[in-house]
């Protein structure tokens, strides 16, 4: 069962300019430590760093839309973090107000699953989020059979 869908498209140069202007203040306010570490591993090319941050920014916007709140109602930037599963597939980890909102949307006996697609083609980055509720037993079976 689909709980929410969100998408976002952003100009990578906009994120690059914000990073240039506000630096650490912006990065600390918006991105998790894991997201920052991922971007910094790409530091040899400033375009790659900006694109990495832009994709994650778009993912947070898309996720907040899928939650039905936007960045308000207790859902903040750092409550949503992009992580990669062992096979490399991106997903999101929610904490704080975002996790509280997700839990409120998830029906009893179900587990929330967040599917994320992120991409970039200079100068644009895009993210698409689908939040689904799946039976808790099915989620357990997936984790035990992997």
Curated annotation (Swiss-Prot):
Reactions mediated catalytically? apo-[ACP] + CoA = holo-[ACP] + adenosine 3',5'-bisphosphate + H(+)
A family per Pfam:
ACPS
Tell me its cofactors.
Mg(2+)
The EC number of this protein is: 2.7.8.7
Q: Where in the cell is it found?
A: Cytoplasm
Which residues are Mg(2+)-binding? 8, 61
- Coiled-coil-forming residues are none
Report if keyword DNA damage is assigned: no
UniProt entry keywords in alphabetical sequence: Cytoplasm, Fatty acid biosynthesis, Fatty acid metabolism, Lipid biosynthesis, Lipid metabolism, Magnesium, Metal-binding, Transferase
Q: An example Gene Ontology cellular component term from the record?
A: cytoplasm
Function (record text): Transfers the 4'-phosphopantetheine moiety from coenzyme A to a Ser of acyl-carrier-protein.
Q: Which family does it belong to?
A: Belongs to the P-Pant transferase superfamily. AcpS family.
HAMAP family this protein is in? AcpS
Return the protein name.
Holo-[acyl-carrier-protein] synthase
What is the protein's species of origin?
A: Rhodopseudomonas palustris (strain ATCC BAA-98 / CGA009)
Show the taxonomic lineage.
Answer: Bacteria, Pseudomonadati, Pseudomonadota, Alphaproteobacteria, Hyphomicrobiales
């Amino acid at each position: 069962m689909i709980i929410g869908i969100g998408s976002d498209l952003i100009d990578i140069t906009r994120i690059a300019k914000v990073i240039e202007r506000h630096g650490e203040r912006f990065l600390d306010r918006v991105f998790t430590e894991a997201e920052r570490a991922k971007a910094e591993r790409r530091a040899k090319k400033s375009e790659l760093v900006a694109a990495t941050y832009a994709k994650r920014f778009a993912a947070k916007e898309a996720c907040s839309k899928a939650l039905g709140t936007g960045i308000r109602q207790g859902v903040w930037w750092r409550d949503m973090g992009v992580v990669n599963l062992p096979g490399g597939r991106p997903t999101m980890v929610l904490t704080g107000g975002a996790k509280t909102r997700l839990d409120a949307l998830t029906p009893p006996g179900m587990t929330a699953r967040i599917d994320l697609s992120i991409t970039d083609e200079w100068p644009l980055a895009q993210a698409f989020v689908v939040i689904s509720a799946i039976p808790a037993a099915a989620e357990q079976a997936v984790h035990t059979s992997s």
